């Protein structure tokens, strides 16, 4: 299997340096994606006021609920493509690529219609205050118009990650990120378009990243080359993509439903707390990118080595990923804790908003390494093709704990601090269940 200069050989050689080489561009890519939203938040917070800031921020959990099922399914495409590519199965690899891209296009169009029709209703269901709901609904509707571009980019990038290429998606996001930032400044500051301006800028930047990743696949002279005339659904491979991807997507969607429920609890404190949570939640996003990039590496490396039956190497991959994840997330979490006030001032100058954001960060940043551990074991299991049970355990541990917390504890001790202690509590419980599940699945693999 001949590899180009962008690809990483996951099945041979040292592991730690290759994991870092794979994870670092992926981490930077995730940071750039978050910066789309961060720039939106910073620009509206600074130039359109706290109500506009709350309007944009209140849509985050809902957008994630709508999109994460399909983004989760892209993990199934990643796992299947990695397995076929490592095994040198060119025809199967090509069919997987064309099935994945077709699925991305269809799901993106569906999500665009869903967002346009149900955005305001969903915001009302969450109890979004009257003073921001109009702007929130406008932002969501424009954002969802770009959903086909968003989906095509993410599925295309999943294919590239499957073959060990995380550098080109990073380059594409650098280009689209610069465009997004420039358009934000032009549309909001010069043309005073407020939330509509930042939404339009995001859609245009997503279109650019979509075009770049599709061009990359189209011009590739490999088994994953894209031919538009071959775009169709292969039901055999679609089923295999769904077997891994749907549980991952359901898990992500349900967890974001719990976050939407938590957003509703934050909404009960008013627009100031909402703005503080918006800024703090954006910081969480940067922390999660660090742990998720290692999880993605673990899944891709595990899948390729599983495809060529290098089971002992899979174990070393998991151990090295745990080391990278814990060190990275703990360091970043401590940084966010100690410099939280300075970071929050980037988003807003309102002292009350900063106070609310600091209260949230105080209970969630230092223990964030637990979130990394919690995600790694399901990532390794998905790499081996097991996705259903990890999904159930994550829903029970994460969502169940937060629901019990929100309805059982929070009403009797109403404060942002009490509300957000539910995060580390849910991470700890889920880790215990996921490690137990991994132990039994891994024993079965040893006997294969």
Walk through the language-model features, giving the residues of each.
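Helix-terminus/linker motif at the lipid-water interface of multi-pass membrane proteins
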Residues: 35-54, 123-130, 186-193, 253-286, ...
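Small-residue-rich hydrophobic transmembrane alpha-helices
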Residues: 53-113, 150-169, 276-334, 338-340, ...
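Residue-level signal for short hydrophobic patches within transmembrane helices
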Residues: 12, 16-35, 39, 62-69, ...
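Short runs within selected transmembrane alpha-helices of multi-pass transporters and secretion channels
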Residues: 74, 143-161, 169-180, 198-213, ...
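Short alpha-helical transmembrane segments in multi-pass integral membrane proteins
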Residues: 1-23, 81-146, 190-246, 302-367, ...
